[in-house]
Amino acid sequence: KLIEFTNLVNECCSVMEDSYVADWLNKPNPDLNMEVPIDIFREEGMERILRLLYFIEIGEADV
């Protein structure tokens, strides 16, 4: 799980400012039905979050 978390943080850093990643992971996100990304990671894994990061990267979702 630690390696997966590290990979998740690296993915986040590739699409947003490094200094914002911790806040982003711990705040309810409207693009995730107001769920908290880190909670989704713990309960489901990375897939939904990686999909959102992709949409952020291509400009289809906001950070």
Which residues does each PLM region occupy?
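Non-transmembrane "mature" sequence context
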Residues: 1-63
